[in-house]
Amino acid sequence: MNIAVVGLSHKTAPVEIREKLSIQEAKLEEALTHLRSYPHIEEVTVISTCNRLEIYAVVTDTEKGVVEITQFLSETGNIPLATLRRYLFTLLHEDAVRHLMRVAAGLESLVLGEGQILAQVRTTHKLGQKYKGVGRLLDRLFKQAITAGRRVRTETDIGTGAVSISSAAVELVHRQVDLSSQKTVIIGAGKMACLLVKHLLAKGATDITIVNRSQRRSQDLANQFPQAQLTLCPLTDMFTAIAAGDIVFTSTGATEPILNCENLTGCVINRKSLMLVDISVPRNVAADVHAMEQVRAFNVDDLKEVVAQNQASRRQMARQAEALLEEEIAAFDLWWRSLETVPTISSLRSKVEDIREQELEKALSRLGSEFAEKHQEVIEALTRGIVNKILHEPMVQLRAQQDIEARKQCLRSLKMLFDLEVEEQFG
């Protein structure tokens, strides 16, 4: 069995492609069940964020397993395979392990070192367990990656001063207008909306309206910023709020655009401009709004220029983080390679146990039934103790052997000397 990751990210695919493959949490159980139904996928889980969709899997046949994952993505996004392959990346074995460690540490994020991804990796692990996708290998891998991400944030300064998607979106607007004089509307009341409010207030915004379907969630958000006096608006009045606003941020979990050229037309009559900043994936704002003369629209891919200026000063911190990651990669690799010994050890124990039982039966039959009944438990314990003591030290040394080639040679010798039949499980 081997570990593989197949996916795409902000580095390989535009938002138009990423949004088609986004898997919302409500659909995750169905997706994992579908993936596990393929014949060559043993374990699987999915990281799905606004900037990446990555499927981590333990496969019994690497080539066939990757083909199955690619086919799943093509069907999920309704994207022809020939088109999809241009945007996908595939990483195998240690490269897949290293990639997850880098993702958890924030080194693969649009915003280098951002902290939100570690929580998303942790959620991926928990949901993978909940929906029976994560088994022994992925469980250990994700735990090691979470440890790696936590170490990077506590032992380096990479998380200090990092911009986030939300802060980059606010900075993008701040560079173009004076936020203190603008009426700002936020559609959505989740974590991203909360961060938007925080960064808007820091940049001097004073007139902020929250539009959301759930009045309770809107109020919960407003309670976190009592000094801001946020205006709360039900979703039914969304277009009234937009018509009165100058800047609109969208951050909802909608799977289809909620704003488009047709439904915004009435909001821009008799006005010079409306700025739309969509930080959702899938997008909340349809591409056709770019045709509207009064509208300036941006999405997450437009934030790269803002983010780039924050990256240069963080490269040295990233190098420190990479050194830590190598330690965690080595720790996982040592554990993973030790699994190679399991089938051989099990086969040897089974063979020795068969011999013990056969010889014990012969001895008891010679001793007679009266003696056997009286002393069988003692003799049984004696023979088990001898077998366990003989096998214990070689097994400990075999598992502890860090030299991969030396361990493989030991395994080959055991198979030959004891004529063991071993089913290979890991490669």
Swiss-Prot record:
Transmembrane segments: none annotated. The record marks H99 as: Important for activity. One of its GO terms (biological process) is protoporphyrinogen IX biosynthetic process. Pfam families: GlutR_dimer, GlutR_N, Shikimate_DH. Keywords: Chlorophyll biosynthesis, NADP, Oxidoreductase, Porphyrin biosynthesis. One of its GO terms (molecular function) is glutamyl-tRNA reductase activity. The keyword Oxidoreductase applies. It is an enzyme of class 1 (oxidoreductase). The active site is at C50 (nucleophile). Its EC number is 1.2.1.70. Belongs to the glutamyl-tRNA reductase family. Possesses an unusual extended V-shaped dimeric structure with each monomer consisting of three distinct domains arranged along a curved 'spinal' alpha-helix. The N-terminal catalytic domain specifically recognizes the glutamate moiety of the substrate. The second domain is the NADPH-binding domain, and the third C-terminal domain is responsible for dimerization. Catalyzes the NADPH-dependent reduction of glutamyl-tRNA(Glu) to glutamate 1-semialdehyde (GSA). During catalysis, the active site Cys acts as a nucleophile attacking the alpha-carbonyl group of tRNA-bound glutamate with the formation of a thioester intermediate between enzyme and glutamate, and the concomitant release of tRNA(Glu). The thioester intermediate is finally reduced by direct hydride transfer from NADPH, to form the product GSA. HAMAP family: Glu_tRNA_reductase (MF_00087). PANTHER family: GLUTAMYL-TRNA REDUCTASE 1, CHLOROPLASTIC. Homodimer. This is Glutamyl-tRNA reductase.
